[in-house]
């Protein structure tokens, strides 16, 4: 009798396991790429990336000389700043959380509202924004031209020591393209290592992809877990996001923001474009039932129910996307 009971339990577990496994998409959809993309107008080279790294960490790119790109995009904070709102942005209307620059080589739209389409274009924005680095590019070029130590770096990167706005942005973009997430346990599982992630994470992957459950994959797709598109997810914010950059009649873009990647998230946030949510449980709670209902709300924002186990499994899966901090030592500053 005991034997038959054990057989029944094992059979039930096998059927359940087969059921959720059958719903999984092919792992290949989430396989990491083998190379880093770069535009033909700015081929990726070690020399340009090395120059870009120095510029990225140099506080002299700001008017005050006290803020670098790395101030808000720190290696110690998953290439963000760990803050709800950026430094000096507390008084800014509709301030937005600092996004990570990890895996930005693959982005087709940058900034939360997609106002930049290339890393080269984006590199200008924080330098010239008043509540960020608050500089002008002509003055920056003049400042760097007076720093003798930069001349050999520009020569190695571009063939001569001429310093220009274009070369500065190309170098910064090149360095950012080299910032790629470390291999995560999920990546090893995708590659065939069945022991790389827990059974809980595997079940969470099923919940993540199940249209009748969380259906996170509707927006968080591809190996970076983003569709690179814009969605209104029903946050109580007056910020129009992408809607302020397109004609007002484009209703779906009102309150819409770029889908962030789920790779290498910090343990407790802050999350969302405005840093308004901390903790993955609170994020799940929002998606389950707390989105503000309005005309622009994404069609993928459908209420759903999860058991406590399914929530825990979903969080375990998201945590399996963490490859650990991409540590880079700050370079010596040229004089």
Curated annotation (Swiss-Prot):
Post-translation changes: Binds 2 heme c groups covalently per subunit.
KW Nucleotide-binding (keyword) present: no
GO biological process terms held by the UniProt record: methylamine metabolic process
Lineage top rank: taxon: Bacteria
Keyword Glycoprotein annotated: no
GO MF: calcium ion binding; cytochrome-c peroxidase activity; electron transfer activity; heme binding
Localization in the cell: Periplasm
The protein's Enzyme Commission number: 1.-.-.-
Binding locations of heme c 1: 69, 72-73, 273
Annotated residues for binding of heme c 2: 216, 219-220
Keywords: Electron transport, Heme, Iron, Metal-binding, Oxidoreductase, Periplasm, Signal, Transport
Task performed by this protein: Involved in methylamine metabolism. Essential for the maturation of the beta subunit of MADH, presumably via a step in the biosynthesis of tryptophan tryptophylquinone (TTQ), the cofactor of MADH.
UniProt cross-references to NCBIfam families, sorted A to Z: TTQ_mauG (TIGR03791)
Protein name: Methylamine utilization protein MauG
Record organism: Methylophilus methylotrophus (Bacterium W3A1)
